[in-house]
Amino acid sequence: ATYNIKLITPEGTKEITCSDSEYILDAAEEKGLDLPYSCR
């Protein structure tokens, strides 16, 4: 399955697609988005 993800950031809204076997953070990084995280 593929999901449409809407990310609301201080810079604006971004939309990405993500498969059910992929982490949202990884999908965002592939699209060039720099999301804050501390879980890796």
Curated annotation (Swiss-Prot):
Q: What does this protein do?
A: Ferredoxins are iron-sulfur proteins that transfer electrons in a wide variety of metabolic reactions.
Alphabetically, the GO molecular function entries are: 2 iron, 2 sulfur cluster binding; metal ion binding
Q: Which UniProt keywords apply?
A: 2Fe-2S, Chloroplast, Electron transport, Iron, Iron-sulfur, Metal-binding, Plastid, Transport
**Any binding details for the cofactor?**
Binds 1 [2Fe-2S] cluster.
Protein name, entry field:
Ferredoxin-2
Q: Where is the 2Fe-2S ferredoxin-type domain?
A: 3-40
Look up the record and report any one GO term of the cellular component aspect. Answer: chloroplast stroma
Q: State the taxonomy lineage.
A: Eukaryota, Viridiplantae, Streptophyta, Embryophyta, Tracheophyta
